[in-house]
Amino acid sequence: MSSNDLMELFDTEFTKLENLVNEINLENELPVNQIVSIYYQITNVASMIEVMKQQIDNSDSSFHEKISNTETFISKKFNSIIHPKIMTNITNSISEITNNLQSLNSEQKSKETIENEAKLYEKLREIMSTKEFVKQYDSGLSND
């Protein structure tokens, strides 16, 4: 793959990342698929940066500027602002669902109550899995 092809691919992937980040509304609970997409794209772009640093000519200042701008975007906008809010939202969702499940009367349950409880458990499982996925990203941050 030529340097130009690599830069073009990088630009495309970074644009996807920017779009995903700009679509986030942290005031609302984020759907799991949106969270996974964002972290996948962040990881993808960060990996591309590492590969590109090794493969692109050091004298190419436009490349270094793009990389620097991208690293700043990830660090200042995502890692410092968005990532902590996502972690907080996930933790709050887990707490809320857990409280809802604990408040359900464990005695005589109607079919509807049992179905609602099952849905809450499924949602709790999904969010807890997402939290583990996001924590892996968090671990990577602390290793940098």
Pin down the residues of each PLM region.
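Long, low-complexity or tandemly repetitive, helically biased scaffold regions used
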Residues: 2-7, 11, 15-142
